Amino acid sequence: GYNYRMPNLNASLGIAQMKKIKYFIDTKREVASTYKEFFDNSNIHFYDEPNNAKSNFWLNVLIFENALLRDEALEYTNKNNIITRPPWKLMTKLKMFSDCEKSEITNSEDLESRILNIPSSVPLKN
């Protein structure tokens, strides 16, 4: 059988973090608001929450017009100690799924080449 019990130390840590959840989400929303305002009048699209939802902004994302601009921004930010990264690879591109049935996912493939994940941690200050 499986042992799904959580060790006491992990449970204590989880309870302590849950007591701060409102602060964490409020701070992430403030950071996202700053990003949104900063990129508002540019050719770089900040991926915002949809009108019918409320995001926790766990991960903030920029969408560029093309892969070259994204790659230039990735290089520039990382050279200047701003840690950014491309998104995770699409599952269809992972070796372990190479033999699986695949659909046409041109939109996902296009976005994968133009997305940049930007700093999203709670300790960020506006």
Model-derived regions: residue spans:
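PLP-dependent aminotransferase class I/II
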Residues: 1-126
